[in-house]
Amino acid sequence: MYSYHIERHFSDRNNWLRASVLGANDGLISTASLLTGVAAAAPDFQTLLLTGVSALIGGAVSMAAGEYVSVSSQSDTEKADLHKERYELANNPDAELEELTEIYRRRGLSDPLAAEVAKALMEHDALAAHARDEIGITETSAAQPMQAALASAASFCAGAILPLLVALTASSAIVPALAVSTLCGLAGLGYVSAKLGGAPVIPAVLRVCLWGVAALVITGFIGKLAGVAV
């Protein structure tokens, strides 16, 4: 008796993992950078609260809208390709069969086997076969705009809440507190994203921390130069 084994791959998580990592990273860095600049100029509670909440809400909405529009464009392109493929299958099936056969030949199958595989897949689900092997669209890689938008908004809020809480609760030395907490958050984010994606941990952590430090230094310097409420 045979058991049916389904192997999960890291690439299956691409759609939501990319949007989530981007959203959390953006929320953490942008909010921390903005609060650092403001704190360096005018570190009063009311200004920090207004700045932080505005950054969180505005950033989350912006991320969701941008991600939805971007992924929707990708989805529209995929639908157009599938519509074209559906038309070709209905009007020129022999040419489509030969096209699929040639794809399998280029992948190393012998001519008879390539023709046999192409014919079997065309009989089973012709559109799915061409979508997968000719266009490169699969169930796991297909664009999902709403999923990406919600993941971006939620992860942005998750990333932005850390520097906001630190800025509002730190009684003194707000800028150093923001810097330390942001770097810790970025290191944690890099670690988690690397583990979920099956990538090396150290390069992922260094990558996000490097850009975080650059953003904090630049905005803190600008805020210090301004010396007034932003």
PLM features: residue spans?
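Cytosol/matrix-facing amphipathic helices and coiled-coil assembly/linker segments
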Residues: 1-12, 16-18, 71-153
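Structural signature of hydrophobic alpha-helical transmembrane segments
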Residues: 172-185
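Juxtamembrane boundary at the C-terminal end of a transmembrane helix
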Residues: 220-230
